[in-house]
Amino acid sequence: MLELGKLLTALIAPPLNTFVLLIIAAIIYCVHFKKLAKFIAIISFTWLYIMSAPFTGLLLTNNDDSPALTLDEYKQAQAIVILGGGSYQTKELYAETASGAPQLERLRYAAFLQKETGLPILTTGYSLIGISEGDLMAKELNQFFNVPTQWIENKARNTEENASFTKNILIKDHIQKIILVTNQWHMKRAKYLFEKQGFDVLPAAAASYGSKGNLSAKSFIPDLGALNSNMVLLKEWIGYWKAHYVE
């Protein structure tokens, strides 16, 4: 079911949906429905352009409407929860597996918050390669930031499981009010799913994907960076709608 959901999401966004639509258009063209084939091809390239243009990021980026919080407010929490954000295998000397950019951004912010608040940390996340994200984050927090980890959750495969499995751990210590650390583009969905589990969530959003600022001529010129960030943002909106309205 998890893999089916990922496939359906991939079919909505380029480049897979562009490829699929062009194959469909070619088949239809061969059976002499040429106008319909041309229409499908136009739709395919239009959607590819929209998803590749920076202006789309302006529309999708502002998906976290949580207010900015102060350190005094964060100090009212009982624990800090860091969500896994991806890892990769490396030839760097310090480890065989390392945190990817989004996960490292989360670790950096969480380390700062822990040193300012003194709160215990829980890391959560599974991985298909090598060490789990939960274990890897705990290791890197200690190795690079000299910050300890109180709890490690290493089975969660998605944000919904992050929330559910975290509850199973923290409920034993009667912890309900948490600082939730993830990237800005992921926060809206993550916050909703953790609140659904009964947590009182103080959002702590790390660095963000997407375009910021005002529209300019450059905003309408497609580029690969915009395609990548727009796909991430679209995936998050789809995930939020699915969690909020379907489940």
UniProtKB/Swiss-Prot annotation:
Q: What is this protein called?
A: Uncharacterized protein HI_1701
- Name where it's found: Cell membrane
Biological source species: Haemophilus influenzae (strain ATCC 51907 / DSM 11121 / KW20 / Rd)
Task: Read off the InterPro entries from this record.
Answer: Cell_Envelope_Assoc, DUF218, Rossmann-like_a/b/a_fold
The main location is membrane
Provide the leader sequence positions. none
Task: Provide GO CC annotations from the record.
Answer: plasma membrane
Under the heading PANTHER family, the entry gives: ENVELOPE BIOGENESIS FACTOR ELYC (PTHR30336:SF4), INNER MEMBRANE PROTEIN, PROBABLE PERMEASE (PTHR30336)
> Which GO BP annotation is one of this protein's?
peptidoglycan metabolic process
Keyword Metal-binding carried by entry:
no
Its organism's taxonomic lineage begins at: Bacteria, Pseudomonadati, Pseudomonadota, Gammaproteobacteria, Pasteurellales
Q: Which CDD domains match?
A: YdcF-like
- Any stretches that span the bilayer, and where are they? 11-31, 39-59
Annotated membrane topology is: Multi-pass membrane protein
Q: Which UniProt keywords apply?
A: Cell membrane, Membrane, Transmembrane, Transmembrane helix
